[in-house]
Amino acid sequence: MAAAGGAEGRRAALEAAAAAAPERGGGSCVLCCGDLEATALGRCDHPVCYRCSTKMRVLCEQRYCAVCREELRQVVFGKKLPAFATIPIHQLQHEKKYDIYFADGKVYALYRQLLQHECPRCPELPPFSLFGDLEQHMRRQHELFCCRLCLQHLQIFTYERKWYSRKDLARHRMQGDPDDTSHRGHPLCKFCDERYLDNDELLKHLRRDHYFCHFCDSDGAQDYYSDYAYLREHFREKHFLCEEGRCSTEQFTHAFRTEIDLKAHRTACHSRSRAEARQNRHIDLQFSYAPRHSRRNEGVVGGEDYEEVDRYSRQGRVARAGTRGAQQSRRGSWRYKREEEDREVAAAVRASVAAQQQEEARRSEDQEEGGRPKKEEAAARGPEDPRGPRRSPRTQGEGPGPKETSTNGPVSQEAFSVTGPAAPGCVGVPGALPPPSPKLKDEDFPSLSASTSSSCSTAATPGPVGLALPYAIPARGRSAFQEEDFPALVSSVPKPGTAPTSLVSAWNSSSSSKKVAQPPLSAQATGSGQPTRKAGKGSRGGRKGGPPFTQEEEEDGGPALQELLSTRPTGSVSSTLGLASIQPSKVGKKKKVGSEKPGTTLPQPPPATCPPGALQAPEAPASRAEGPVAVVVNGHTEGPAPARSAPKEPPGLPRPLGSFPCPTPQEDFPALGGPCPPRMPPPPGFSAVVLLKGTPPPPPPGLVPPISKPPPGFSGLLPSPHPACVPSPATTTTTKAPRLLPAPRAYLVPENFRERNLQLIQSIRDFLQSDEARFSEFKSHSGEFRQGLISAAQYYKSCRDLLGENFQKVFNELLVLLPDTAKQQELLSAHTDFCNREKPLSTKSKKNKKSAWQATTQQAGLDCRVCPTCQQVLAHGDASSHQALHAARDDDFPSLQAIARIIT
């Protein structure tokens, strides 16, 4: 009864305090926004719901106010609470572990219910005392599981936990819950194959248990490595790693961002260690040097002779023959008498100078008398040495050394050997001027090689006897060709712009992989290093003393071929030596081809009734077919050569590009330029091949490419008649004979070719509306036309289909920039045919009725012209520069005086 009375008294006191103070209950919680069924209040008087306060103090073990962060040692749970200072907390029910006071038993019951572990599927069962018991019950009875990661990291009440089946649990871990879009699953560490609560926990794990590059991390990269071995590889590849000495076992500190930092580290940390390692590799050996008398024995006077004058004068002649140890001891004693020796050395020098003056006076008297016995006597007597003769001790069997001198006068001639026999009266006297040298003979200088001709050797200028040249003068051997030995018939250096070059344009963008590169200059120049015989009598005479012909020389033609090589004019030495790669069978073939006489018959035009499909280039065999070519003599067309027995190809076959010739015999390319047939037989001595101007010389033997097959991608290309002479399908009714036009030559690049080509490409892209698929199709058609896979008419039609009416805007520039003269004529003919078909027949005037091959560029509506010399289609602005290029090629026709000078 007393206890009940005390409880009633506490309740009455609390109600009285609540009535006197304003109410703290009602409303919603500032944290969870839930109803304030029961309020938790601390000394800061900030009310929160009892759930949030219990979660903070019991589950999270945090005892501060969730509103103001003030540390709350005690809190009171109740439904209607006054100010905390007015509450008699010592009279309330108390939870000692968490310092929670309860206003009544109902609030305490709510608090205990929050912390109970009840099964959500079995409400009739009593609560479990531990969460592990509830988890075991759920797994056994209901086959439900809770997420271990959520259980470990999420501090929530038991009734708030989620239970999953096995399938749902796997989806929850990888993807998240369908009803909770804020959770996207638990991220996986690919190194450990373990999942973490969220990305923050995964990042903590990677930073704590794995490795990352601190250089890349400062730059914003998020790259991690499973162990340090992979990080070391990253340091070695992307940064600078020091692996010397102790740094090979260090981590992180031996990697550097820049090479300068690495060098500074090596200088500061490893320079001493490298010096120590080098010192450890040294082996200490005790040895001593013998006296150095070699320079004095050779008759050379140096500074050490004057330094050791007094030492030798004191030691005497006998002391110089002593042992090595005695000499070392005397040398040691000499060091301690430096001042005295200096004075004695000065006296010795003065004495030697006086003796030298006396010798010069005596020598002048002997020369005035001119008596030979006097000279011999003076030579036999020799100069009187004030110190006596100085000779180093010789071993047994050693011959007498050269004469020595201790003065600083001229060196005697005996110190230098002469290759020729010495004159009987030329004994050298020290200090005297050298006597007149005897006349040198050819026998005194035998040649070093028997095969070297006397005409090629360089005679040395006679000089004083005994004086040697500081360097050897190389004699011109029979294998050393000089440029002046071979005056050039044609300039060996091609003028820029005259030879066809590999052009970078829109035409070869799609077929660049199928081109064949010309031989590099390094391969051409290797021919100049091969030995050949020199022309003239010296070559024959030198051949007698040389080795006999080898088998290779006999296969190459023997002396006759070598003589041909030596007598023909060449443009350079490398082109002469490049002829060694020609086999005898090829030479015979060339002679046979060169002996053919040009005919006078004109080539018959192909039948005018050929179907349009004949313009398609079929796959032809790899063997070359020769077409009728006009003979050009002194620049005038006399008529084509008779057609050979090769099968005649259908008209319209495209011709291979001039920039990429196949390796063919040299007669196919005459020296005077232009597509000429084989000429008249050359004069004697000129039967060898004459290289084309601007054509690289053939490679040396062993480097000749096979001539049986054309380059890849050109197997279907055969030479064809000029397209201007082939009637098109639109002119099958014409009866006029076509006039003969000059054959197209190599394409000459116009001015600003690259800029104009880029502008053309951009224009085509704009007309195609930057459609890459259509632009790729255009490039594909262009490449097929350049390779001869489609005809000009087909290519023209495909371009019109792609560009429509805009094709006429770019066709003029497209035609001018096409780097192939033959293809230009084909495309121009196709354009003319199209224009003729578009015009009605009734509107044509009679004077303009011409065949398609006679149509001009003005009639076709083009702003261009055709060069009458090379048949290249030009813009009007390029005509002057193009004619200048033709004028620069006038050296293709050398003067007859130059040829006569070379022959004689």
From Swiss-Prot:
Annotated region described as Disordered, given as residue ranges: 312-469, 490-656
C2H2-type ZnF: 187-210
Biased composition (Low complexity): 346-358, 418-431, 447-461, 502-513
SMART domains listed in its UniProt record: ZnF_C2H2
Enzyme Commission designation: 2.3.2.27
Location in the cell: Cytoplasm, Cytosol
Main location: cytoplasm
One of the record's GO molecular function terms: ribosome binding
Alphabetic keyword roster: Cytoplasm, Metal-binding, Phosphoprotein, Transferase, Translation regulation, Ubl conjugation pathway, Zinc, Zinc-finger
Residues the record lists as Phosphotyrosine modifications: 306
Residue ranges, compositional bias (Basic and acidic residues): 359-388
Zinc finger (RING-type): 29-69
Ranges annotated as biased composition (Basic residues): 534-543
Positions with biased composition (Polar residues): 404-416, 521-531, 564-584
PROSITE patterns (UniProt xref): ZF_RING_2, ZINC_FINGER_C2H2_1
Keyword match Zinc: yes
Entry's Gene Ontology BP terms: negative regulation of translational initiation; protein K63-linked ubiquitination; protein monoubiquitination; protein ubiquitination; rescue of stalled ribosome; ribosome-associated ubiquitin-dependent protein catabolic process
Chain positions found as Phosphoserine: 437
PANTHER family given in the database record: E3 UBIQUITIN-PROTEIN LIGASE ZNF598, ZINC FINGER PROTEIN 598
Protein family (similarity comment): Belongs to the ZNF598/HEL2 family.
Subunit architecture: Interacts with the E2 ubiquitin-conjugating enzyme UBE2D3. Component of the 4EHP-GYF2 complex, at least composed of EIF4E2, GIGYF2 and ZNF598.
Entry function: E3 ubiquitin-protein ligase that plays a key role in the ribosome quality control (RQC), a pathway that takes place when a ribosome has stalled during translation, leading to degradation of nascent peptide chains. ZNF598 is activated when ribosomes are stalled within an mRNA following translation of prematurely polyadenylated mRNAs. Acts as a ribosome collision sensor: specifically recognizes and binds collided di-ribosome, which arises when a trailing ribosome encounters a slower leading ribosome, leading to terminally arrest translation.
Protein name: E3 ubiquitin-protein ligase ZNF598
